[in-house]
Amino acid sequence: MQKGNVWVVDDDSSIRWVLERAITREGMLCRAFEHANDVLKALNSEQPDVLLSDIRMPDMDGLSLLKIIKEQYPTLPVIIMTAHSDLDAAVNAYQQGAFDYLPKPFDIDETLALIERAITHYREQKQPNNAENILQSVSDMIGEAPAMQEVYRIIGRLSRSSISVLINGESGTGKELVAHALHRHSPRALAPFIALNMAAIPKDLIESELFGHEKGAFTGASQVRQGRFEQANGGSLFLDEIGDMPLDIQTRLLRVLAEGQFYRVGGYAPVKVDVRIIAATHQDLEKRVNEGDFREDLYHRLNVIRIQLPPLRDRTEDIPSLARYFLQKTAKELGVETKSLHEQSLKTMMEYVWSGNVRQLENVCRWLTVMTASQEIMPQDLPSEIRLADEKAKNINRLTSQHWSQHLSLWADEALGEGKENILNDALPQFERTLLLSALAYTQGHKQDAARLLGWGRNTLTRKLKELGIEDY
């Protein structure tokens, strides 16, 4: 039995050649097309097991072709390829019935595995759901890293669902952006999206915030107040930092999820709601469950679908596009011309470890827009903590092969061999400078903390900064 019949349509001849060669090597038939209209003509006499289509082509684009195919050949799996990989492209493809979404440049082995899955799917005659067009919007989510592409895929696959989702990720990775995207690209898109941060509300107010209260329920309750559940009725409720929710509120939340109704604080009449829960946390909820700080049954109720957001250090290839976007966004907000990053500045930013992730990068871009005098952002314009980290990294790279004392010994031997004197006076300032820069980088520029780590007083550190020519402090 033939392994499969694969069609490829792409106006890029090199893409057609690479795919055709790889597919035929796997023992599958492959037919390549330059134009979408040629595919439609060929479908009148023959039907493949799977079609790979580029999204941007002359005459007819991939999404238009996909729409026609889903109307006339609903069981034919279509894989959408695009070099313009973003959330909207992925969601549009899934919503219109694509089998999967393949960002360029793609890995050939992964592509072949995807083709085989599509062929299996086709031969099992699994009828896909008809796609529904929903509200389209521009997203602030940016990223071409593989980890972000997987996030796009999940959002796309959930675009016809109202299932609960748990978003995991470090602080600043964009959990609320993902929650907004899940809502915008769902059947609830036109209904309210309500967000509540558990960590930002005093514990004694959380119950009233979530469920509302009746008049006279407690001192100061002068009128009936709707809680976030009622405000989100028909839409989505985003519970940020769910790991900080008190146990008694967890019990009430579990009951609402199970029964679809609740009682306001001080109330006796049940309030029915239809709400999709999207929860997020930077914590390890499984660990919280094991420690008795989070209900296991609630964890399983929320953890139906989990989205893991990558930290910025795992998607450094996205830093240039993110930085450009944030610089443009800030310039537009302030009504000024957009600044550009010098090549070395961008290199330094890509090598920096962004502990605050995307949020920290955005704040730095805001700072640069305001504080940089010239139109081009030079390395010396970067915040001191980034410049110090860069200098520290360079120093570490010089010492990777041997212990620092060995390098010092080699330097001393060379200096003495050259007849130099007073070498201690030459070495000590450099030694102090290295330790001082490391301490300042570690404390993010806090002089008092750096002085304590070095065993100095604050005045000594200030004097050393001046002696060693370390500025900006």
Swiss-Prot record:
4-aspartylphosphate: residues bearing it: 54
Keywords on record: Activator, ATP-binding, Cytoplasm, DNA-binding, Nitrogen fixation, Nucleotide-binding, Phosphoprotein, Repressor, Transcription, Transcription regulation, Two-component regulatory system
GO CC aspect terms: cytoplasm
Localization (cell): Cytoplasm
Disulfide bond residue pairs: none
Gene Ontology molecular function terms on file: ATP binding; ATP hydrolysis activity; phosphorelay response regulator activity; sequence-specific DNA binding
Positions that bind ATP: 169-176, 232-241
DNA-binding region listed in the record: 447-466
GO biological process, one term: regulation of nitrogen utilization
Record domain Sigma-54 factor interaction: where: 141-370
Domain Response regulatory: 5-119
InterPro entries given in the database record: AAA+_ATPase, CheY-like_superfamily, Homeodomain-like_sf, HTH_Fis, P-loop_NTPase, Sig_transdc_resp-reg_receiver, Sigma_54_int, Sigma_54_int_dom_ATP-bd_1
Major localisation: cytoplasm
Record function comment: Member of the two-component regulatory system NtrB/NtrC, which controls expression of the nitrogen-regulated (ntr) genes in response to nitrogen limitation. Phosphorylated NtrC binds directly to DNA and stimulates the formation of open promoter-sigma54-RNA polymerase complexes.
Family matches, as PANTHER family: DNA-BINDING TRANSCRIPTIONAL REGULATOR NTRC, TRANSCRIPTIONAL REGULATORY PROTEIN
Name this protein carries in UniProt: DNA-binding transcriptional regulator NtrC
